[in-house]
From Swiss-Prot:
Compartment list: Cytoplasm, Cytoskeleton, Microtubule organizing center, Centrosome; Cytoplasm, Cytoskeleton, Microtubule organizing center, Centrosome, Centriole
Keyword field contains Transferase: no
Effect seen on changing residue 385 to A: Decreases interaction with alpha/beta-tubulin; disrupts association with microtubule distal tip; no effect on association with microtubule lattice
Record field: compositional bias (Basic and acidic residues): 541-550, 635-650, 717-764
Region span, Alpha/beta-tubulin binding: 319-394
One cellular component term from this protein's GO annotations in UniProt: centriole
Sequence segments annotated as region (Disordered): 190-211, 386-414, 436-479, 521-551, 611-789, 845-865, 1096-1153
Protein's UniProt name: Centrosomal P4.1-associated protein
Biased composition (Polar residues): 400-409, 679-689
Single GO MF descriptor: tubulin binding
InterPro entries: CENPJ_C_dom, Tcp10_C_sf, TCP10L/CENPJ
Effect of substituting residue 341 to A: Decreases interaction with alpha/beta-tubulin
Keywords of the record: Cytoplasm, Cytoskeleton, Disease variant, Dwarfism, Intellectual disability, Microtubule, Phosphoprotein, Primary microcephaly
Length: 1338
């Protein structure tokens, strides 16, 4: 359950924001754990009056808002509170301030976050019913014991509702009062009593949210301690501004700090850790403890202010309720005027200055003893710039920013860093002069300006400390004070932007920071220093006094400017020469980098001519950074050499602001030129100091201090610049050009730093010389830059304007602004030199060189010789670097002014080296330019080549793609064309259609005829087949009859022969001879017949004999015209049975002869002989000896006929081989195949189907088929076929061709293509698939 806040809680919304938002590292943590609602109830019960609650609440607010990054700071704050007599009250008020008057959302968050803290801090609160309520309220959300505390909560809620209504009413009344008061008075931007809208106007755009929150806080806290503001404006402003800048978003910090001295003391104490850390670092380099003394003085002043505030708060205890306390105008309550306070400050600063001078005389020796930082190794130069710089800036920025809201702090510091990097002359003077205009830009400025303000208070405090401390300590305090100055500067800038009336007062606070200088300067400053106080208490009538003092200051400044102009030329020349000599002595080694010294000399000469292009020697970075406000200028000067430089810068700042205020006309007339010149120098100095800070060279205390301070100072410088820019924009007095010039300068310095080659062995020495010169020059230039800080230089804009205008305006402004009274602080020569350095714009001086030089120059304190020659250098923080340079030069501090001779020698040497360096420089520049041009040309060529290659590849790819596409198109078109042609061919023309029709008709007719013929042929074939069968049967029957009749005939013949034998013996003999012949043939045939009978016809013997005898008869027929008569008698010889034959043989044998080899020869009566061989072979020889028959044992039979024919029968193959006397050989195979081998080698083969094949000796073959087809095979394998229909075919390995009788030729190739040539000349070609490839019609 969330409880609605009361009016006290609404007012405490500011505190809530501070508690909740102040420190980015501790974001979301509420430092004061008191629950505002419960506390409000508690306060009612405790009847705490306004006087007690108000300062307490203020202290609590400051305490809760403490700007500390670490818990130690919180502890320190607690210590401060414990020291604070009003601590119990603060504890009471803590609860109220814990939760600011925020919207419901923030309140809810506060309620959530508060419970835990409330329980933790129960003991801290006064034990009463309110504490019990607190415990219940906080335990409820944490432990969820709502049942136990319901009653208490209900009561509390009712009370809270009542209180809330009352407080809201009171708040509205207070706001109305504040509005009325504000309408009559110009309030500070951070402390604006205006409503949210108006207060936001004075805030930066990023602060709008916090502005709303702040408005709630302002009514209750604004001007709680006017006495404190009056009495210690500079210190309080510094702390308040620093805190305010830290919480730039909230703007509550300033109000809270002002609310009570406790707040202020706590704020100081919060800043103290940072400053103490800086002091510690400074003490490392500077054994003296002046900074500590300064701090003590500041704390004492703060305590006094707190006492005054407490008194006033006691007086203001009229209000019964904390939230109802009236907001009284601080002006009426002031008991001490700002002029009085300035007088006191001036006295303190004079004392500190004296002490510093004494310590400076003592300090250089120990400082001189410190080892010189060795040259940077490769890669360390830029790395040290960037890394160290970023580290220091980050660390210090974080310190400054922690009090600011995280969101605002980050952008502010980012802007600061960027701006610091740029060459910018701070516009603090312009801001002071243009405060009425600044109000317009107050929003933008509050961010950057807030940082600057916080830095300014630090600078003021540091300036006080510096006056007490030696140069080293001054530098240390300068670092610490940088944050204060920044705070002050931010605060003052905001005040100036919000308070047009305080325009004159703005320079006065700047003087307040610088009051430590001279009384004369302090007098000038009095109006300036009163500025911050008057800003804080803008309502006081002191403004009029300030304005009067400002007018007087303007007159004095104008006089100083005139003096400066007169002495400028001479002083510039002398100062430059002296600085060069000092650097030369400090950096004895001269190398190619020593050309920087020559460069500086040239630049000095160019400055006189108005062509100074670089601000390297003029490096018054602190001035640059702080020119926006003299305090900020002091911070930068402190950054340079927080000792003398702080003094000088403070003094310079005051006069500068005075000048800017008093001589607003002059600033208007000369601001552009002067500011340009000063900004050049300041921007250069800033760059040097920034570089030095980044480098963090431990050799010189000033370097280390400046490093730390640079982080701080750089931030304010950017803020101051922003303020200056805004003020310039707002005020016609400020040159618009200057704002951009600032940033541009920083950029140029950066560029120069980058351009410088830190690796050069002598760059460090050159840089140190340059730096020393720059520091010396920058000290005056700082003052001038403070006056000219309004001028900002953009790198884009030419420095020629500065050079032209710097000679005049820079001299005047430099004298006045630098010293307030240039004669007082600086000798005329030095002032001239400073202005000269400002004019000088060392164009290419790189940041690295500036850094290294600044390191070297910073490391040793300014030598006494330098102080003797140029007393103005002593107070300036840059003088520390100069002192370091003098130490390097081994010029003892005690050396009398008689060292001018040595300085002259050094000058001559430097001039000689300068000429040489210039030569190297020119050559190097030309070479670098040529190299750059060559590299650019090569790069361009490479790019062109790469582009050409790429274009070529693309073009080739495109051409190839186009080619492929065209090929695909062609293929498609070809396919389409082929299809078209094929389709066209498939459609015959009219003539062809007629022919086709005619042919079809003829084919139909022929088919019909063929069918009829086939029918007829089939019938004829069947008829003939039946006839053949009948004939075969008849033939068989006839043969059977013949056999029977032959048997009968033989029987009858035998009987007749037996009868006649007895009668005719002689006839017998004749018959015997003939019978022998016939028997021989008959035997051979008979044996064959027997074999046939056994194999084929075992049941019949006659048919085989007949069939056996048939072949000889056929053979006879086949023989050429040979008669078959000899065969005919064989048939009757075959018929007699073997028995009969044996009987007949037995009867016919006349004799038998046995041979020794076992063969037996029988002689028959008819004269034939039979020889039987032992192996079964039988040989028969006819009576005439012409017919010989040999029957072999294997069944083969060989017959030699009377006509010399030889018939050989192969029993196994059943083949008959007949050889004729002329050489013809005829083979009869059992299958019916007949082969004839002619003597000439020709062979004729007749197959059973009556096909005749002729084989010619030359290899040709000819086959004649029964249908009349003739096939001829050539020796080459070609085959020619002639059909009976007149067609011819030719078969080769490549093709087959058919020729038709009508002349058409069709050829089929091996690949399947078909080509047809018609008699008309038409040619048609088809592929293997039958597709028509070509068809020509003639």
């Amino acid at each position: 359950m969330f409880l609605m806040p009361t009016s006290s809680e609404l007012n405490s919304g500011q505190n809530f924001l501070t508690q909740w938002m102040t420190n980015p590292s501790r974001a979301g943590v509420i430092l004061n754990r008191g629950f505002p609602i419960l506390e409000a109830d508690k306060e009612k019960r405790a009847a705490v009056d306004i006087s007690t609650s108000f300062p307490i609440k203020g202290t609590h607010f400051s305490d809760s808002f403490s700007f500390i990054n670490e818990e130690d700071s919180l502890l320190e704050e607690q210590k401060l509170e414990s020291n604070n007599p009003y601590k119990p009250q603060s504890d009471k008020s803590e609860t109220h301030t814990a939760f600011p008057c925020i919207k419901k959302g923030p309140q809810v968050a506060a309620c959530h976050s508060a419970p835990g803290h409330q329980e933790e801090n129960k003991n801290d609160f006064i034990p009463d019913l309110a504490s019990e309520f607190k415990e219940g309220a906080y335990k409820d959300p944490l432990f969820k014991k709502l049942e136990q505390l319901k009653e208490v909560q209900q009561k509390k809620q009712e009370q809270l509702k009542r209180q809330q209504l009352e407080q809201l009413q009171r708040l509205m009344e207070e706001q109305e009062k504040l509005l009325t008061m504000v309408s009559g008075q110009c309030t500070l931007p951070g402390l604006s009593l205006l409503p949210d809208d108006q207060s936001q106007k004075h805030r930066s755009p990023g602060n709008t949210t916090t502005g709303e929150r702040a408005t709630c806080c302002f009514p209750s806290y604004v001007y709680p301690d006017p006495t404190q503001e009056e009495t210690y404006p500079s210190n309080i402003l510094s702390h308040e501004q620093s805190n305010f800048c830290r919480t730039a978003h909230g703007d509550f910090v300033l109000t809270s700090k002002r609310a009570s001295p406790n707040l202020f003391s706590e704020a100081q104490y919060q800043e103290a850790p940072v400053e103490k850390n800086n002091l510690k670092e400074e003490n490392r380099n500077h054994p003296t403890g002046e900074s500590i003394l300064c701090w003590e003085k500041v704390t004492e002043q703060i305590q006094e202010a707190n006492d005054k505030n407490l008194q006033k708060h006691d007086d203001s205890s009229e209000v019964a309720n904390i939230e109802e306390r009236p907001i009284k105008a601080a002006i009426g309550e002031r008991k001490q005027t700002f002029e009085d306070y300035l007088e006191e400050q001036i006295q303190l600063e004079e004392q500190e200055l004296k002490q510093k001078q004494l310590k400076e005389a003592e300090g250089p020796l120990p400082i001189k003893a410190k080892p010189k930082q060795p040259f940077l190794k490769r890669g360390e130069g830029l790395a040290r710039f960037t890394n160290a710089k970023s580290k220091f800036q980050k660390g210090k920025e974080s310190k400054l920013v922690t009090n600011q809201s995280t969101s605002e702090d980050q952008p502010l510091f980012k802007m600061d860093r960027q701006q610091l990097q740029r060459k910018t002359a701070l516009k603090n003077k312009e801001l002071c002069a243009d405060n009425p205009i600044l109000k317009k830009d107050s929003k933008a400025r509050t961010k950057s300006g807030s940082v600057t303000l916080s830095q300014k208070p630090k600078m003021l405090k540091c300036s006080n400390r510096k006056s007490l401390s030696p140069s080293g300590l001054k530098i240390q305090t300068g670092k610490k004070c940088d944050g204060q100055f920044r705070d002050q500067i931010k605060f003052e800038n905001k005040v100036t932007s919000n308070n047009k009336e305080n325009v004159t007062e703005c320079p006065k606070p700047c003087d307040t920071g610088c009051t430590g200088w001279n009384k004369t300067q302090g007098k000038d400053r009095l109006p300036l220093s009163t500025g911050p106080a008057s800003r804080l208490a803008a309502k006081s009538p002191i403004r009029e006094t300030m304005k009067e003092s400002e007018s007087s200051l303007d007159v004095s400044l104008q006089k100083k400017l005139e003096t400066w102009e007169r002495e400028k030329e001479k002083e510039n020349l002398e100062l430059d020469e002296f600085l060069f000599l000092e650097q030369a002595a400090d950096e004895i080694s001269f190398s190619s980098n020593s050309s920087f010294v020559l460069k500086i000399l040239e630049r000095d000469q160019q400055i006189c001519k108005g062509h100074r292009m670089s601000s390297t020697p003029v490096k018054a970075v602190p001035q640059k950074t702080n020119p926006a406000d003299p305090i900020s200028h002091c911070n930068r000067s402190e950054d340079l050499d927080h000792t003398a430089r702080e003094k000088e810068s403070e003094c310079e700042v005051a006069p500068k602001q005075l000048h800017s205020l008093s001589s607003a006309d002059e600033l208007r007339e000369q601001p552009c030129k002067i500011r340009k010149a000063v900004q050049k120098s300041t921007s250069e100095n800033q760059t040097e100091w920034n570089a030095r800070d980044d480098e963090g060279v431990p050799n010189s205390d000033s370097s280390t201090d400046s490093e730390e301070q640079l982080d701080v100072t750089i931030k304010p410088s950017t803020e101051d610049r922003e303020r200056g820019i805004s003020s310039r924009e707002d005020s016609p007095q400020v040159c618009d050009d200057k704002g951009p010039f600032k940033d541009t300068r920083t950029q140029e310095d950066k560029r120069r730093d980058v351009d410088l080659d830190l690796s050069d062995k002598d760059y460090s020495s050159d840089e140190s010389i340059m730096e020393s010169i720059k520091h010396k020059v920058s000290e005056p230039s700082r003052s001038s830059s403070l006056s000219l800080s309004k001028m900002d230089f953009d790198d884009e804009r030419t420095w020629t304007d500065l050079e032209e205008n710097l000679c005049n305006h820079d001299v005047v402004l430099g004298n006045e602004s630098t010293y307030g009274t240039p004669q007082t602080c600086y000798p005329n020569n030095e002032i001239g030199i400073l202005d000269k350095t400002i004019k000088r714009k060392i164009a290419p001086v790189k940041r690295g060189e500036d850094l290294s030089k600044s390191r070297r120059s910073r490391s040793p304190p300014t030598s006494e010789l330098m102080m003797k020659f140029f007393p103005s250098l002593k107070p300036k923080p840059k003088s520390d670097s100069h002192l370091g340079n003098e130490l390097k030069l081994n010029i003892s501090q005690d050396q009398p002014p008689g060292d001018n001779a040595r300085s002259q020698v050094l000058r001559e040497k430097i001039i000689e080296l300068e000429t040489e360096i210039e030569k190297f420089k020119a050559e190097n520049a030309s070479l670098a330019k040529l190299r750059i041009e060559r590299e650019s040309a090569l790069e361009k060529l490479r790019k062109e080549i790469a582009d050409f290659e790429q274009q070529k590849a693309k073009e080739l790819a495109r051409i190839e793609e186009f080619k492929k596409e065209e090929m695909r198109k062609l293929q498609k078109e070809r396919k389409v064309f082929e299809k078209y042609t094929t389709a066209a061919r498939t459609f015959p023309d009219k003539k062809e259609r007629e022919e086709i029709q005619t042919l079809k008709q003829q084919i139909a007719d022929l088919r019909e005829d063929l069918k009829r013929k086939e029918t007829k042929w089939s019938s004829t074939h069947s008829r003939l087949r039946s006839q053949i069968q009948m004939l075969v049967r008849e033939n068989t029957d006839l043969r059977e009859e013949i056999k029977v009749m032959e048997r009968f005939r033989l029987d009858a013949w035998k009987r007749a022969e037996a009868i006649e034998s007895s009668l005719e013996v002689e006839k017998k003999d004749k018959l015997a001879n003939t019978s022998v012949r016939f028997q021989n043939s008959q035997i051979s045939s008979g044996t064959q017949v027997e074999k046939y009978k056994k194999n084929y016809l075992p049941m019949q013997g006659n048919p085989p004999r007949r069939s056996k005898s048939a072949p000889p008869r056929d053979l006879g027929n086949l023989d050429k015209g040979q008669a078959a008569s000899p065969r005919e008698p064989l048939e009757p010889l075959n018929f007699p049975d073997p028995e009969y034959k044996e009987e007949e043989e037995d009867q016919d044998i006349q004799g038998e002869i046995s041979h020794p080899d076992g063969k037996v020869e029988k002689v028959y009566k008819n004269g034939c002989r039979v020889i039987l061989f032992p192996n079964g072979t039988r040989k028969e020889v006819s009576a005439d000896g012409k017919t010989i028959t040999v029957t072999f044992f294997n069944g083969d039979v060989k017959q030699v006929m009377p006509d010399q024919r030889v018939i050989y029968y192969y029993a196994a193959a059943q083949t008959t081989h007949t050889t004729y006397p002329e050489g013809l050989e005829v083979l009869h195979f059992s299958s019916g195949q007949i082969e004839k081998h002619y003597p000439d080698g020709r062979k004729e083969i007749t197959f059973p189907d009556q096909t005749v094949k002729n084989l010619f000796p030359d290899g040709q073959e000819e086959s004649i088929f029964p249908d009349g087809t003739i096939v001829r095979v050539q020796r080459d394998g070609n085959k020619l076929i002639e059909f009976n229909n007149g067609q011819r075919e030719l078969h080769t390995a490549q093709f087959k061709r058919r020729e038709y009788p009508d002349g058409t030729v069709k050829t089929v190739y091996a690949n399947g293509h078909q080509e047809t040539k018609y008699r008309s000349g038409r040619i048609r070609v088809k592929d293997k698939e039958g597709n028509v490839l070509m068809d020509t019609e003639l």
